[in-house]
Design a protein with these regions (language model features):
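Bacterial N-terminal signal peptides that target proteins for export
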Residues: 1-11
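Bacterial N-terminal signal peptides
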Residues: 10-19
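Beta-sheet-dominated interaction scaffolds and their linkers
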Residues: 25-56, 97, 171-185, 193
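Short, solvent-exposed loop/turn segments enriched in Ser/Thr/Gly
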Residues: 40-46, 106-107, 119-126, 184-188
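Short acidic, flexible loop segments centered on an aromatic residue
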Residues: 54-55, 59-85, 130, 193, ...
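Terminal connector regions
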Residues: 64, 113-162, 242-270
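Intrinsically disordered, low-complexity Pro/Gly/Ser/Thr-rich segments with frequent PxxP/GP/PP motifs
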Residues: 79-116, 212-242
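Intrinsically disordered, low-complexity segments enriched in serine, threonine, and glycine
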Residues: 180-271
């Protein structure tokens, strides 16, 4: 059997978003800033895409749904509940497909329009920027023998879009702090708990008395409203790992427009 055209098999490779709202998420030759959108009310904002590659690149933009699990991973939603459907439908953005020249930026406008009578609360979806592969030349019939496949990676960047309606509150707790290992290296394990009607997003830090910098830190930690507890294992700073045992202070500092705000702190002894 001869095919004159190669059949292309696309492999999607999603990327988890980077920690801080002011940072840039990147995959391939695409940078996205900011990496997290919070919309309060009807006022919108902008996202800047930057093509840092040497070739023209095209990206398709779509609204996707993800659910967080207890270990912090984000799973695709197969069957959306009513809240997720509402979140997906209220997010407005333009354009939905962009072609960006090398070393040039592109602005995406984004806003949310809540349906009349929608209850106060937090609604979240995720914006996916997926690369569109350039067209491939068709092999001449004389060169196409049998069935051939070509794997073309399709890269994507996903960022959360959080819509908040009303005066929402959240409380965070830190529990079960203990020494652990991550990929065979020393680490700190702990559980973050969340209560309230909104998500939280910030940094987890572990301090030892007399040492200025954290002996362990995890930036950009989110706890979304679908979970109440998130388990974490944070690698220790290799230069400070030998002094980890003993009394420590662990805190969770949320990133806000007005600077970092401490939401939780606990003192314990690492054993």
């Amino acid at each position: 059997m001869t095919l004159a055209r190669r059949r292309l098999l696309a492999l999607a490779l999603p990327l988890a978003f980077i920690a801080t709202p002011g940072a840039q998420a990147g995959v391939g030759d695409l940078l996205v800033a900011p990496t997290r959108i919070v919309l309060n009310g009807s006022r919108g904002t902008e996202i800047v895409l930057s093509n840092i590659g040497d070739d023209v690149a095209t990206y398709r933009i779509s609204v996707e749904l993800r659910r967080m699990t207890g270990n912090g991973s984000l799973d695709d939603v197969v069957e959306a509940n009513e809240r997720e459907k509402t979140a997906q439908s209220m997010i407005l953005y333009a354009p939905r497909r962009v072609t960006i020249a090398p070393n040039q930026p592109q602005t995406i406008r984004i806003a949310a329009r809540a349906p009349a009578g929608l209850p106060d609360g937090e609604y979240r979806a995720h914006l996916l920027f997926r690369a569109v592969p350039p067209p491939r030349p068709v092999a001449p019939p004389s060169q196409a023998r049998g069935v051939s496949f070509e794997l073309i990676p399709i890269y994507g960047v996903t960022i959360p879009v959080v819509v908040r309606l009303g005066n929402l509150q959240a409380k965070v707790g830190i529990a079960n702090v203990a020494l652990a290992s991550s990929n065979g290296k020393p680490a700190v394990a702990l559980d973050l708990t969340r209560a309230g009607d909104r998500s939280v997003f910030g940094d987890v830090r572990v301090f030892k008395a007399g040492i200025k910098e954290p002996i362990a830190i995890q930036r950009g930690v989110a706890i979304y409203t679908e979970i109440e507890t998130r388990h974490m294992v944070i690698p220790l700073n290799p230069a400070l790992a030998t002094s980890a045992a003993g009394p420590v202070t662990v805190d969770f500092v949320e990133s806000t427009d007005n600077g970092p705000v401490s939401l939780a702190e606990t003192k314990t002894v690492l054993r």
